Amino acid sequence: MVGFEDHIAAITRNYQVNPRLDYRTVTAVNGPLVILDNIRGPKFSEIVTLTLGDGTQRKGQVLEIQGKRAVVQVFEGTIGIDAKHTRCEFSGDILKMPVSEDSLGRIFNGSGKPVDKGPNVLAEEYLDIQGQPINPSVRVYPQEMIQTGISAIDTMNSIARGQKIPIFSAAGLPHNEIAAQICRQAGLVKKSGKGVIDDHEDNFAIVFAAMGVNMETASFFKRDFEESGSMDRTALFLNLADHPTIERIITPRLALTTAEYLAYQCEKHVLVLLTDMSSYADALREVSAAREEVPGRRGYPGYMYTDLSTIYERAGRIQGRNGSITQIPILTMPNDDITHPIPDLTGYITEGQIFIDRQINNRQIYPPINVLPSLSRLMKSAIGDDMTRGDHSEVSNQMYANYAIGKDVQAMKAVVGEEALSSEDKLYLEFLERFESSFVGQNHYENRDIFNSLDLGWSLLRTFPSNLLKRITEKTIKQYYSRSSKGTVDSTN
């Protein structure tokens, strides 16, 4: 008998049984939140499976713990949950995302489940959607340019690999079309047939997350990616407007977890686009209101700055890893108000902004990017001889200066009339018109590489005599001013 007991102990000593407890203690449902009572040992961020009376299962996450009381946010919404028939099972684990290189070319909903009629992704790893904290000392400064094929971005507001730079838009502006165009055309700069870094053509991937978009917009993105052939290198996460609002809180984190795996394990250069961050912030406000927290500015929670930083700061590069994450969040400013808390806090965290202008859009110019309030703080590390071309910085500075002067002359013309303008003033007006129509404006499917964009910039700067180009050195003027421009207004690639 003793030997039998020893045998049983030997074959079971390596097994630990943690029975999952099933509760029927729902005490209240408040918006997207479910309050449970008499819970034994709940854990913060623990995943909870709620089984409704009809057998339907929904996932939730522990948001707050007060003794034996737990507040759970339900990702699929709380409609149909009642106190009598709902069973809640605590998993003892946090929310993890199954990740694999096979995620590319797939379409997921806002909860990370495939919706493209394909099989579930065969997971190579399960990663915490909150990401791993990155030691600041091992971060690598962003360098080398991400080429979007859009002249106003590539030439005037160059994006460095590993940068986070938002697009500030507003309702009714073509930010969705711009996002789709960036996905179609984005890549690293190719120079004279040789890449800046090895194998970057094959190692470039895109993770696209849409939050709170309508069915028409979701269909547009899916159709555009499939028709352009960029779907094979894209992982698409779609949270529709009729999906539960609470789901929008985890959608960007699922997308970024996938991006981190592709960047740091598969060593790909990943471009992450998140639209619309305003929908995300509204979902955050809804949860905060349901928890009866003290509201901050315009009803948004006081911790929104910290929460947004947990998303934006997941971009970057790490020592010892060849991959990188470049992030372009897109947000719509309510009432075109750049002082609204969402763009205001986003601007503090990110490294610049690209500004979509309604007045330029009203003049039928696409993409309606206003370069004056736009800024890329890391542009200096993304351009130059080794990465784009030696004249890039000077051309950008000179076009900025001439465009700003042209705007001043345009305002003066409205007051004093064209007759009072000097011949030099008229040159700036001519440059202003050509800059907006020919340089900023381009076709939806026109992919200009950085070298064509710089040549096009020179063709505009030749409007002026060389002595007026005061932000360009004599050496650069001798090299580029007299030669014919390769970039043309009607060129399409």
From Swiss-Prot:
Major subcellular location class: membrane
Transmembrane parts of this sequence: none
Listed name of the protein: V-type proton ATPase subunit B
Topology in the lipid bilayer: Peripheral membrane protein
Keyword Glycoprotein: no
Family: Belongs to the ATPase alpha/beta chains family.
Functional note: Vacuolar ATPase is responsible for acidifying a variety of intracellular compartments in eukaryotic cells. The B subunit is non-catalytic but combines with other subunits to form the catalytic complex. V-ATPase is responsible for energizing electrophoretic K(+)/2H(+) antiport by generating a transmembrane voltage of more than 200 mV.
Induction, per UniProt: Down-regulated when cells are exposed to an acid environment. Up-regulated when cells are exposed to high pH.
Subunit relationships: V-ATPase is a heteromultimeric enzyme composed of a peripheral catalytic V1 complex (main components: subunits A, B, C, D, E, and F) attached to an integral membrane V0 proton pore complex (main component: the proteolipid protein).
Species per Swiss-Prot/TrEMBL record: Dictyostelium discoideum
Cell location: Cytoplasmic vesicle membrane; Endosome membrane; Contractile vacuole membrane
Superkingdom classification of source: Eukaryota
Pfam families membership: ATP-synt_ab (PF00006), ATP-synt_ab_N (PF02874), ATP-synt_VA_C (PF22919)
GO CC annotation terms, alphabetical: contractile vacuolar membrane; endocytic vesicle; endosome membrane; pathogen-containing vacuole; phagocytic vesicle; proton-transporting V-type ATPase, V1 domain
